[in-house]
Swiss-Prot record:
<keyword id="KW-0808">Transferase</keyword>
<dbReference type="Pfam" id="PF03618">
    <property type="entry name" value="Kinase-PPPase"/>
</dbReference>
<dbReference type="GO" id="GO:0004674">
    <property type="term" value="F:protein serine/threonine kinase activity"/>
</dbReference>
<keyword id="KW-0418">Kinase</keyword>
<dbReference type="InterPro" id="IPR005177">
    <property type="entry name" value="Kinase-pyrophosphorylase"/>
</dbReference>
<dbReference type="GO" id="GO:0043531">
    <property type="term" value="F:ADP binding"/>
</dbReference>
<comment type="similarity">
    <text>Belongs to the pyruvate, phosphate/water dikinase regulatory protein family. PDRP subfamily.</text>
</comment>
<dbReference type="GO" id="GO:0016776">
    <property type="term" value="F:phosphotransferase activity, phosphate group as acceptor"/>
</dbReference>
<keyword id="KW-0547">Nucleotide-binding</keyword>
<protein>
    <recommendedName>
        <fullName>Putative pyruvate, phosphate dikinase regulatory protein</fullName>
        <ecNumber>2.7.11.32</ecNumber>
        <ecNumber>2.7.4.27</ecNumber>
    </recommendedName>
</protein>
<feature type="binding site">
    <location>
        <begin position="152"/>
        <end position="159"/>
    </location>
    <ligand>
        <name>ADP</name>
    </ligand>
</feature>
<keyword id="KW-0723">Serine/threonine-protein kinase</keyword>
<comment type="function">
    <text>Bifunctional serine/threonine kinase and phosphorylase involved in the regulation of the pyruvate, phosphate dikinase (PPDK) by catalyzing its phosphorylation/dephosphorylation.</text>
</comment>
<dbReference type="InterPro" id="IPR026565">
    <property type="entry name" value="PPDK_reg"/>
</dbReference>
<dbReference type="GO" id="GO:0005524">
    <property type="term" value="F:ATP binding"/>
</dbReference>
Amino acid sequence: MRNKAVLDLHLVSDSTCETVIAVARSAVEHFKSLEVNEFVWSLVGSKRQVDKVMLNINPERHNLIMYTVVDDDLRKYLKEKATAQSVRCIPVLAHVIREISCYLQVTKDPNAHPHKLGDEYFNRIDAINYTISHDDGQNLWDIDQADIIIVGVSRTSKSPTSIYLAYRGYRVVNIPLVCSVQLPVDPATIADKLVVGLTIDADRLIQIRRNRLISMKHQENCNYVSYEQVVEEISEMKKICAKNRWPTIDVTQKSVEEIAATIIQFFNRKNNRTGDALY
């Protein structure tokens, strides 16, 4: 069996590195035979910081720099340093910016600085804090401040999906639905909110719950993994969602990212939005 090629991938940005990380990870997904060591260099805003990045590049290894740097002088300096060390340097947005410029015959804004630590950054932090404090049905007194409400039985990815959405800027409340226990909030009070129910195949849910019990050393909780109990829980959840006309998502074969993307589509449709994020 052939050994995997190893790449030291240096991701450089004068901002948060979110864009270059997303592009880089999407790209390397196409190379299953590649082993990648990822180095993230965010908030690189001076030549001294560029020098620090370059000093940490091992010349004995395969190296690649992917970057988003707005400042022309700093970008030029980074490319010069990379060339001097024979390191390939790829600007991840240059081609897209150039295509837009050529197509519309407009020049890019020289003062543009994506992802500045402005309102959008602090709004996202606020969304994360709100979502964490409203996990698992907590603090429902200010549920009216939520953008999205997620409901579902235990172990249907409500919490990780909520956190993922919060990172995108959405304020999320997630509420567990417990069989024979009344919904802790009056549906009439959240009629104007997007409420999404997460459902799942019963056999898959039992498997997830059983693994959870093993990890917590609580295997004696038989009802939690009882087929009849699980089927009843899922059925009751579907009835509640149908009664209140809340959309549902079957998460059996879906990743958190896919679940969140579907919820964002619901949100955009409800609010007549065409983008996929609040910012």
